[in-house]
């Protein structure tokens, strides 16, 4: 037998043994869970559009209990629905769980120049978070308020036209147009409204509606192929929507940088406050030093080195990209679920309309009035309890072996929160856990909720940075809609909603009727 054949056999045995060892990881630990097949694990379940995998977690929780494990490709994941365990991982032991699980196709979190807040980790994440945080402060949100206000007014015109004569509409499509219009103006350099004419909307919808992405599966099983696919997509941007989007953002950012340089050279001063995220990111500067860890001494123990206190060109593109995707989809879904629940519960809708009429009596809703819409905030919080949106990112990767509540967690293991089970558990929410009850939030004492039991925007230091922007957009549009209309279900409304999705959990459609409150 030739040497080359012996080497091939040895290589095959080595690879097979490696994957078999990963696949049997939880069995060796005596932890139950869905097994799947060697090499694959249950990776195919992550690509099911008709049955969102995040909802499958709840089915498996019922079968295996509040803690179980599975493998998908080379990843090992522990699923938990114990809020104390979740809080320990996401908050108390953040130094040991500061990274997220990610597919190799998403890039190297330590080396990719365009890495963003969702996938970055360690001190690189900390630097990006520190630099990006001012963009989402109340001061910055005031600067883009007028931009959002313009989109609200434009959406109201489209709603009036679309619902004329009592016609039923798929309000999810309208909300997607609304959020895409805002993101286009604040992150893509778009000037003016492009509702129902935006060439990018269908492409972005396709990112969230893609069924069974074989490339993700390949990269999950054979990680080194991720860099190969990324190289190919960088050379042929049109072959992948994500890369094409990055290219569009690069063009918009380049134009803004060149315009700024030309204005400065000509001695032209800025016309006023920044109007979008591109300006805000270009202007951002930190007044603190950052910690970089070149060793494995732990996230919290590092030495200070000189680090750029501005976002780089590529980093700005990365942040604009993730805010484009996250800001478009999640806010549109939250608005859709809120509208659906209000239509299903007219007594709650009436109470909310009374608050809007009382706190926002003038035609225009001001920034300061938004904070007075306390009951609306309760409605949104309760909506996000019943329909958590981006539960797929409610996970943490163990970066240093540790013990959590008596359980040994090895480095490289992912911990995934079963958010839907937590949000519907009667132990934390009472016997009416399945019911839409905004009043449960009226006391304002969220400490009454078990820590780790409510994760609408995540938990701990990596909680969603865009939470304030999402609330602002949703409150502004809902207030205007409820001032003018009452939301009603029709025979076309799916009750209950049919949920689908991969990255987020979305309804197939939300057909509603908007009945004018006042006759003109």
UniProtKB/Swiss-Prot annotation:
Its cofactor is heme. Pfam families: p450. Transmembrane segments: none annotated. Heme binds at residue 464. One of its GO terms (molecular function) is iron ion binding. It is an enzyme of class 1 (oxidoreductase). Keywords: Heme, Iron, Metal-binding, Monooxygenase, Oxidoreductase. The keyword Heme applies. Disulfide bonds: none annotated. Its EC number is 1.14.-.-. The keyword Oxidoreductase applies. CDD domains: CYP3A-like (cd11055). It comes from the Eukaryota. InterPro entries: Cyt_P450, Cyt_P450_CS, Cyt_P450_E_grp-I, Cyt_P450_sf, Cytochrome_P450_3A. Cytochromes P450 are a group of heme-thiolate monooxygenases. They oxidize a variety of structurally unrelated compounds, including steroids, fatty acids, and xenobiotics. Belongs to the cytochrome P450 family. This is Putative cytochrome P450 CYP13A3. The lineage of its organism: Eukaryota, Metazoa, Ecdysozoa, Nematoda, Chromadorea.
């Amino acid at each position: 037998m030739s040497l080359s054949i012996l080497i091939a056999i040895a290589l095959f045995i080595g690879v097979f043994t490696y994957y078999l060892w990963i696949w049997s990881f939880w069995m060796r630990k005596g932890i139950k869970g869905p097994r799947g097949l060697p090499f694959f694990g249950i990776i195919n379940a992550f690509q099911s559009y008709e049955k969102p995998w995040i909802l499958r977690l709840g089915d498996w929780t019922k079968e295996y209990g509040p803690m179980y494990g599975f493998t998908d490709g080379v990843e090992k994941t522990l699923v938990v629905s114990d809020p104390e365990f979740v809080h320990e991982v996401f908050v108390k032991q953040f130094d040991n769980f500061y990274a997220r699980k990610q597919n190799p196709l998403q890039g190297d979190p330590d080396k990719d120049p365009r890495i963003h807040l969702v996938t970055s980790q360690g001190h690189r994440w900390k630097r990006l978070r520190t630099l990006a945080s001012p963009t989402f402060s109340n001061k910055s949100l005031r600067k883009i308020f007028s931009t959002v206000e313009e989109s609200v007014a434009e959406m109201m015109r489209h709603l009036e036209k679309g619902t004329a004569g009592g016609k039923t509409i798929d309000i999810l499509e309208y909300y997607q147009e609304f959020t895409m219009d805002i993101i286009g103006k604040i992150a893509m350099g778009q000037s003016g409204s492009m509702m129902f004419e935006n060439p990018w909307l269908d492409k972005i919808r396709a990112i969230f509606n893609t069924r069974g992405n074989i490339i993700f599966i390949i990269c999950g099983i054979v990680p080194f192929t991720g860099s190969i696919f990324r190289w190919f997509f960088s050379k042929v941007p049109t072959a992948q929507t994500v890369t094409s989007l990055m290219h569009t953002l690069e063009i918009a950012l380049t134009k803004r940088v060149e315009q700024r340089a030309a204005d400065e050279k000509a001695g032209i001063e800025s016309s006023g406050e920044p109007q979008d995220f591109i300006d805000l990111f270009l202007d951002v500067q930190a007044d603190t030093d950052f910690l970089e860890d070149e060793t494995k001494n732990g996230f919290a123990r590092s030495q200070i080195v000189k680090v750029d206190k501005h976002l780089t060109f590529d980093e700005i593109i990365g942040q604009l990209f993730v805010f484009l995707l996250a800001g478009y989809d999640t806010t549109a879904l939250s608005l859709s679920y809120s509208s659906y629940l209000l239509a299903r519960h007219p007594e709650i809708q009436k109470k909310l309309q009374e608050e809007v009429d009382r706190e926002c009596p003038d035609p225009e809703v001001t920034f300061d009035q938004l904070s007075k819409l306390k009951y609306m905030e309760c409605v949104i919080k309760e909506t996000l309890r019943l329909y958590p949106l981006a539960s797929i990112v409610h996970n943490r990767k163990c970066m240093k072996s540790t013990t959590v509540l008596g359980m040994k967690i090895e480095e490289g293991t992912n911990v995934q929160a079963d958010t839907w089970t937590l949000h519907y558990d009667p132990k934390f929410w009472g016997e009416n856990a399945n019911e839409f009850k905004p009043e449960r939030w009226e006391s304002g004492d969220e400490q009454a909720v078990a820590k780790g039991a409510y994760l609408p925007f995540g938990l701990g230091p990596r909680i969603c940075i865009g939470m304030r922007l999402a609330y602002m957009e949703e409150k502004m549009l809902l207030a205007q809609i409820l001032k003018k209309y009452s939301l009603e279900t029709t025979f076309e409304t799916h009750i209950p909603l049919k949920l689908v999705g991969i990255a987020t959990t979305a309804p197939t459609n939300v057909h509603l009727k908007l009945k004018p409150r006042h006759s003109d």
